[in-house]
Amino acid sequence: MYNASIKKPVWLAAVLYLSVLTGSALGEDVTVSYAALTAAYMDHIVAIEKGYILEEGLNVKIMRAGGGTATQTLLSGQLHFSSSAGTALSAALRGGLVKIVYTNMSRPTYRLVSNKPEIKTLQDLVGKKIAINTFGDTGHLATLLLFKKYGLDTKSFLFIAVRNEARFPAFVSGSVDAAPLSPRDIAQVGPLKGHILADTTKEVQLVWNGVAVSSKLLAENPLLVERFLRAVAKGREFARRYKEPTIAMIAKYTPTPSDVLSLDYDTVLGSMTESGWVTDDVLRDEIMTRGELIKVTKLPEAGQLFDYRIIKKVYAELKKSWKPKL
């Protein structure tokens, strides 16, 4: 059996490892990675704060790490759950023995924005420069899926990786022609009269954040996966119904002005899947697009990369007999 009380590894210097005290020294420890404890992870935050994790007999140990580090640690067997499902999917496409078991958000919260008046349509962007944060990130993938949806050759656009701190100067100066921007970004760009070419939230879906596990853990201890997902699903349903209490919980982990948290909450809410999973056609499109991006020639079937059976079971049971309460 997979040992849930795994040994604590020596993390890379950039990783902050800490325990969340869930109220019981007798609970089973599980280690979960998060790139940041923001509104995008409010399902997990509420699960911890409302005690749903503890109800399942679990104590969460939080590992703060980016998707790359988290996925490597997941593959090594030193991490139970990663919330960086997109990065884990790339690893799985390359043959890594991980599976995505839950998808919380599937609608990318980006608008493709240009501040060039002559650029009015997606077609006008052919041959133009599009600023992204990093190659293969959500903004990049969402833009690729958008172009594919409208039959545009993705090789006809010049994507330039510009780190966050340099993207706005590049956009404002006109050295790039467009960029996928979040609602928070657009609030800053607003006075600059940037205009929206497309809203990816309404146009495409992809596997954004959720939960990835090692294939070994899923095979050897599916009950542990079920307990964790049940707690997270409860946190998710509470968060969807009760905005103000949820924002207060998020603020404990990421102190941010309340108006910004409110915008983030609304943005995440609009991106959430209905019941923690996405359809096969969405999976096929993302597998193909992500595979092309990372140059995987032989693409596996969706069933080798995703297993939504547990989250579907959890949601079916919760809908019959459980409702969130303040």
Model features per residue range: what roles?
Residues 11-21:
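Bacterial N-terminal signal peptides
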Residues 22-27:
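Sec/Tat signal peptide C-region and signal peptidase I cleavage site
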Residues 46-47, 110-119, 208-223, 271:
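A bilobed periplasmic-binding-protein/Venus flytrap-type ligand-binding module shared by bacterial periplasmic
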